[in-house]
Amino acid sequence: VDLKTGARVEGDLNPSSDTETHLELYNKFPNIGGVVHTHSRWATIYAQAGRDIPALGTTHGDYFYGAIPCTRKMTPEEIGGVPGHYERETGKVIVETFEGKDPDAIPAALVHSHGPFVWGKSPADAVYNAVVLEELACMAWQNQLMDRDIPPMQQELLDKHYLRKHGKDAYYGQGKH
């Protein structure tokens, strides 16, 4: 699809019914090159509960620089309207949720009562981030079963794990991807 208009530019199939959401993200988050929307079990559980996925351990910190936020509930006005309106408003609610947050460092959002939208530098990167998100959601759920009031990981540990892999002086792993 054309990222400005949403018009199909090749192929015979219609684009996703969530194209307007994707376009809002592409146009507001300039570094993304792919968007994935799933209804994966564990991340959707958090979305339906209206809860962020907390950063509880180093696995989370290796990929996401903080809690994965859940949007507010959408208003009846945002949900109603002509075809495409709801989907465009969904994108706007995600963008609103990221005011003061870095969408490159936290490449996912949970849409309240709906499910996750995940992005990356490329379509493959977005899919990878969606797989990681689902594993983090499952791990967080299990941790919260053990301790409902489990605190988030130490900020210093989150900084170390995220920045050694993604920071300007990254040294961990096989290079930036």
Place the predicted regions along the sequence by residue.
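Glycine-rich flexible loops
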Residues: 1-177
